[in-house]
């Protein structure tokens, strides 16, 4: 459960930074560009809280509150890149539907789980599509800001975080100190911090 503190900390730092950025133009040309990042950092904060809630007493009913904030977090980051590489107007129109899609993917899993055949395919799509779409947009579309490497690093570190999660039992049996799931939490929080660090240092081009 302690590994969830990283999500909470990065989420709070990110939201605080966005609040400060509203009073200084540094990382954003237009104030509305903050909204997708607000969803991202709020999602990280809620991921930490939701995951702690689940791990306190694991069960399917609580697992939805672990998965939902993370799905929203990923959609927020994807929409932030859409805002900067495709267009702010497009991103703002997509933000609500993307959050709804994230919620629907978890809701669909919960519904099918109750019927005895939990279907994670929509949730997996929400998880992995941003990891493909973000690097492609960074590569193919012109940048409006410096710091693209920070976004690429965040996507890469989060993708890396999925490896120890899939090898959870092996990591714990080898390390005897932490589980693969714990390592995943730490790496995912680091991915979130990469985004915050990028925002702190980037400039318009």
Please describe what each predicted stretch is:
Residues 1-98, 106-116, 145-204:
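Early transmembrane hairpin module of multi-pass membrane proteins
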Residues 104-145:
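Active-site rim beta-loop-alpha module in soluble metabolic enzymes
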């Amino acid at each position: 459960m302690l590994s969830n503190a990283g999500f909470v900390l990065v989420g709070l730092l990110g939201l605080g930074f966005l609040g400060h950025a509203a009073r200084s133009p540094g990382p954003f040309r237009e104030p509305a560009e903050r909204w997708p990042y607000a969803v991202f950092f709020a999602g990280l904060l809620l991921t930490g809280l939701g995951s702690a809630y689940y791990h306190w007493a694991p069960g399917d009913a609580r697992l939805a509150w672990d998965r939902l904030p993370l799905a929203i977090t990923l959609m927020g980051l994807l929409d932030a890149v859409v805002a900067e590489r495709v267009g702010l107007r497009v991103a703002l129109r997509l933000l609500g539907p993307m959050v709804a899609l994230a919620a629907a993917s978890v809701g669909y899993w919960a519904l099918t789980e109750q019927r005895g055949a939990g279907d994670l395919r929509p949730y997996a799509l929400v998880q992995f599509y941003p990891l493909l779409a973000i690097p492609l947009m960074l590569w193919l579309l012109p940048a409006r800001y410096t710091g693209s490497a920070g976004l690429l690093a965040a996507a890469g570190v989060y993708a890396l975080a999925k490896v120890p999660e899939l090898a959870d039992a092996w990591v714990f049996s080898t390390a005897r100190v932490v589980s693969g799931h714990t390592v995943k939490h730490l790496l995912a929080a680091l991915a979130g911090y990469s985004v915050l660090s990028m925002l702190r240092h980037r400039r318009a081009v």
